[in-house]
């Protein structure tokens, strides 16, 4: 059964690309800390390995993005917060 109401299935790689676009937009305008809350499986994909996606973002944007796993999130759900814990973006598939 498809969990989406509109019947569309979005590939996980597109969600990661959407995350990067959001991060890029924020980091080009602001200099503060950035926190990405996401499902533990997505967190593992973004943080594991020598050249993880998190490390690639650091090299590309010269700013560390802290990635926090949230068990209560759906698989492709994520939220982006600034240093003041203000929610910048919320996405749920």
Q: Model-flagged regions — what are they?
A:
Residues 1-58, 63-75:
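Conserved glycine-centered short motifs in functionally critical loops
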Residues 71, 77-93:
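C-terminal intrinsically disordered, low-complexity extensions immediately downstream
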């Amino acid at each position: 059964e498809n969990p989406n109401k509109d019947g569309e299935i979005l590939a996980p790689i597109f969600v990661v690309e959407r995350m990067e676009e959001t991060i890029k937009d924020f980091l080009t305008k602001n200099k503060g800390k950035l926190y990405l809350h996401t499902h533990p499986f997505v967190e593992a994909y973004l943080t594991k390995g020598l050249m993880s996606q998190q490390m690639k973002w650091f090299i590309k944007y010269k700013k560390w993005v802290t990635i926090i796993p949230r068990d209560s999130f759906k698989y492709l759900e994520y939220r982006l917060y600034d240093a003041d814990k203000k929610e910048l973006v919320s996405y749920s598939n």
